[in-house]
């Protein structure tokens, strides 16, 4: 070997040694970091199990949150006579001590019913069993199940459909091996099966569409969110733990003790609620994509149910981050470390409920797909089952009440994912569902103002800039928790689950009908009734006449109008007349059954139902129980002192009210679980009859001939209420007459139908059917509020200008009693619109996207815009279920409205002019005329024509320097300008300093999207101060919001000085920013 070769070998050895040492140091560092993280996480684990639980010597009592099932091998010890794959029910919950529970329930089997053919005996059943087993084996050739049809039993049941004089008849209960085989078996029976002596026969199936978990809950008398007990000695610790729960055990379903949610068992367990948010570093001009863009921060807040403040606050950051007071900042060097740390955090903290805003559509799917791209196979194990990965799939939810929405279903086994965005869309009608807008509306709080376009810059900065981003991320995790508490979602949803008997997750993922069906199945089971499949039940065709609305006598009433309301009208009708599936007599049976005429109710729509003396209906029984329970809950609520108990009781009474009102809709849903138009049409026909009856009695009794001062006049009737003008001038007198009328008329109705007096409107503006406004009085001393129905103050699809204009006019007319002032106010607003002095945010229209563009028969403005936005940037374009904000722009003459709709941000950034005439003719004119026509003789001529409509200015948003519009008047220059949104800006600039800042920069600075789409704020003014921060000039913008809200919002954005000097304004304390604006400064407007 030469000397040169020796040196080469030595170099290789040294290099290999160095590489080895580097790898070893990396491994050691990774181990140290993991150990440090484990030590950190250990503080946040659940309390340890007591000796009694460990030794299985004490009973287990827990509140269940989630129920599902899994297919696994039969438990040999609990079920010695069973083998092969079976369905095992899993119940997840929490004990009162805060221990997590996974209860594996064995022995419950799926089943359904068919009507037994006449003359079928035990031998025939055995042969039928063999034939059905053979057909099942053919249909499921790839299955490893030993026996598909476990057994067939003859039982005595009766169909819920139609009145029958016999108590019961033979049914066959078919028990199958696995839940998925119910549908397979049903299909075989629907198509027909060859039977000896009967030939090819098809069978009507009963309860074959009941979900397996719900079937289990019904048969075991378990309702959503209730407490379940298992006595000591009746459960066995799972031999090999399959979950991460502290308590995991197996038991037979017959050993479960289900407690009704009353008294001590109405309380809530200390659930752990995790609220989280993620931030991603997107590329410039692109919405973050998990295939390219890293997750840079994850903020977490964990709260115990019933407590105000989180007991865990942390943020996991990629790279260093400066400390945040009260927050555990956890920096990591790589994205892989961030994701795995969050996975470990989830496992250690073990949350029962995971919340956030849009987490099901964005945060969770993004994390899962990002980990997949980084090849972190172990990341998606976020549920409570070992080695089980989170599953994400696209879903489309559609119902008449909630509309159609595209989303994603995220299955985190053993935990409830509670997406606040989805809940807000289901429960509230808002113009905008952005987190900023919703938080502003309900909490008077807003997000930290960091525009998405600078997130990557903040991440690429230093520890201080990443701290700013972390505060932003933490706020986005904090606001959903505040919304959850403020709106009492946990209490309300748990109570709804308890009342209706469905799992909590069903309330989030399904419509209304499953809740009524659950109650119906429970009551039917108690009475040995069975429910046929929906498609074969009741009437499938036809429509029925809706509720009566008495002709509205439009006008402006300056005397009190008493309102008489029916208490729970539709539920009361169903109870009073015993309307139910099982009390309905079909025409062909009416003569055969030979029912005495006095024992039936013939409804105004021509249907026949037996009275309760022959058979009490199930629907009336359910309604009676719900309404009685609601009265009890409301009475308990008045007596309750504990805030948590009050929250539970209030949630319960609300759930009971909603459930009672849902029953009628369930019967009328033609594509529902069990439609029956005979019931729904009978209910509405009785309602129409009662409204007419009430009108006649009021106008017959309250007359001058009967000694009253004036003749009463019914000016309007709407579904379940009647408006009466008794002619008196005093509110108190109208109230007394209203009470007298309600008591007199109630006595003429069948109980429990009751007419109640609740309120007086004074004054009252009746515009047309379903449209009115008035001051709402429940006490004679003072009015409670201004109440409106069907007009633009409560409609979401009008621009904010219309809502504000209508609301302010009504305020002047009804409260100020200043009609001339209201007229002048409208003229001023129209003039401002035509002269381009109107805030752009007031012109934004929002509409829901319920279908894709191809599914609409007629082209719509918001739909066409959504398609154009999708072509520009598919990632940020609206999806089905979103609300689309847009404005109408100037275009060629004859262009359709759908061709002129445009994204407000796009309009601002591209200096596109707005079409004021569209807004005048299509947005303002009709709502304003509806209000003023009952008041003014020539409303159209006075309001929409005249000198205030003759001056028109069309200017576009400018992108040149903002000082182009100002004149130098003082050393400290003060300007007000019209900047697209027409907020008022007051810019304070150091002497001789010049600011160069484009409209586009201001758009970023002010986060315009936060305020577009009618977010609920009317921005009156703003101040911009320029100070030095991080060695660069920074603009701090203060918004002065509507005085009633007192919101103070400020953002920071770098600005460029053009004179090359280093002169800046003095540094202001933040408190100095909250000064009132000078409102006397003259406008300086751009000229077209």
UniProtKB/Swiss-Prot annotation:
Q: Which UniProt keywords apply?
A: DNA replication, DNA-binding, DNA-directed DNA polymerase, Exonuclease, Hydrolase, Metal-binding, Nuclease, Nucleotidyltransferase, Nucleus, Transferase
Pfam assignment, any one:
DNA_pol_B_exo1
- Recorded source organism is Glycine max (Soybean)
**Transferase found in the keyword field:** yes
Gene Ontology biological-process entries: base-excision repair, gap-filling; DNA replication proofreading; DNA-templated DNA replication; nucleotide-excision repair, DNA gap filling
Q: Could you tell me the EC number(s) of this protein? A: 2.7.7.7
Q: Which residues form a coiled coil?
A: none
Keyword Cytoplasm in the entry? The reply is no
GO CC annotation: delta DNA polymerase complex
Q: Which reaction does it catalyse?
A: DNA(n) + a 2'-deoxyribonucleoside 5'-triphosphate = DNA(n+1) + diphosphate
Q: What does this protein do?
A: This polymerase possesses two enzymatic activities: DNA synthesis (polymerase) and an exonucleolytic activity that degrades single-stranded DNA in the 3'- to 5'-direction.
Question: Which InterPro entries did the record assign?
Answer: DNA-dir_DNA_pol_B, DNA-dir_DNA_pol_B_CS, DNA-dir_DNA_pol_B_exonuc, DNA-dir_DNA_pol_B_multi_dom, DNA/RNA_pol_sf, DNA_pol_B_thumb, DNA_pol_palm_dom_sf, DNA_pol_type-B
The protein's GO terms of the molecular function aspect are:
3'-5'-DNA exonuclease activity; DNA binding; DNA-directed DNA polymerase activity; metal ion binding; nucleotide binding
User: Assembly and partners?
Assistant: Heterodimer with subunits of 125 kDa and 50 kDa. The 125 kDa subunit contains the polymerase active site and most likely the active site for the 3'-5' exonuclease activity.
The molecule here is called DNA polymerase delta catalytic subunit
Principal location: nucleus
> What is noted besides the main data?
In eukaryotes there are five DNA polymerases: alpha, beta, gamma, delta, and epsilon which are responsible for different reactions of DNA synthesis.
Looking at its record, which EC class is this enzyme? transferase
Entries under Gene3D superfamilies matching the protein: DNA polymerase family B, C-terminal domain, DNA Polymerase, chain B, domain 1, Helix hairpin bin, Palm domain of DNA polymerase, Ribonuclease H-like superfamily/Ribonuclease H
* Compartments (UniProt record): Nucleus
Top-rank taxon: Eukaryota
The encoding gene: POLD1
